[in-house]
Amino acid sequence: MEKGPVRAPAEKPRGARCSNGFPERDPPRPGPSRPAEKPPRPEAKSAQPADGWKGERPRSEEDNELNLPNLAAAYSSILSSLGENPQRQGLLKTPWRAASAMQFFTKGYQETISDVLNDAIFDEDHDEMVIVKDIDMFSMCEHHLVPFVGKVHIGYLPNKQVLGLSKLARIVEIYSRRLQVQERLTKQIAVAITEALRPAGVGVVVEATHMCMVMRGVQKMNSKTVTSTMLGVFREDPKTREEFLTLIRS
């Protein structure tokens, strides 16, 4: 039986599509299998130095002068958006006053812990607890830009070095005069003291009233928020922690 001429298979037209609507692809050619490449791991971000006691200064006096007009203009826009007239007599200077006040409320951005502690760490063979309590604290809630106010209690167990007592209050001032949440503020104070002195332990307790709870939202006038950070023996030894908590309540 005679065979007719062998015909090559008809080529599929370009752009031909499968029944699922996607373009057809040629089958993969055989070859050595390769392990699937793993996506590169994202590089770990280095810790920001601004939280440590040697952190950089986020803002300077020159920044204040340069940014004051823009900040005042922003407050003027806020007044207009509230339905007020920034040009009426009682509000003419309000944008500038508010801008200057906000720079003061956040002046902690202009200082670092190393500025404060430079000459105030002393060698001293004292191995009993040091406590400074009832340090007044004023800060700004970063969520609503309204104040929260209260008191800070600090205790540490020295390790051959002590800190000038007023410097503990200065540490509180630097970190509280920023846009904050109370939990972070409490930890920053404790970590700064730990990094500066390397004591056997540090305990910090913050009690505060938040205007965002008093003036808005649930409007609870007498509520207080209490946060604590315990490091070193204050965290590991229940007796040391209890002694600290008892002394700040006395």
From Swiss-Prot:
GO terms for cellular component: cytoplasm; cytoplasmic vesicle; cytosol; neuron projection terminus; nuclear membrane; nucleoplasm; nucleus; protein-containing complex. In epidermis, expressed predominantly in basal undifferentiated keratinocytes and in some but not all melanocytes (at protein level). Residues 1-14, 35-44 have a biased composition (Basic and acidic residues). Changing G108D: In HPABH4B; intermediate phenotype presenting with dystonia and motor delay. CDD domains: GTP_cyclohydro1. Keywords: Allosteric enzyme, Cytoplasm, Disease variant, Dystonia, GTP-binding, Hydrolase, Metal-binding, Nucleotide-binding, Nucleus, Parkinsonism, Phenylketonuria, Phosphoprotein, Tetrahydrobiopterin biosynthesis, Zinc. Zn(2+) binds at C141, H144, C212. The lineage of its organism: Eukaryota, Metazoa, Chordata, Craniata, Vertebrata. It catalyses: GTP + H2O = 7,8-dihydroneopterin 3'-triphosphate + formate + H(+). Its EC number is 3.5.4.16. This is GTP cyclohydrolase 1. Optimum pH is 7.7 in phosphate buffer.
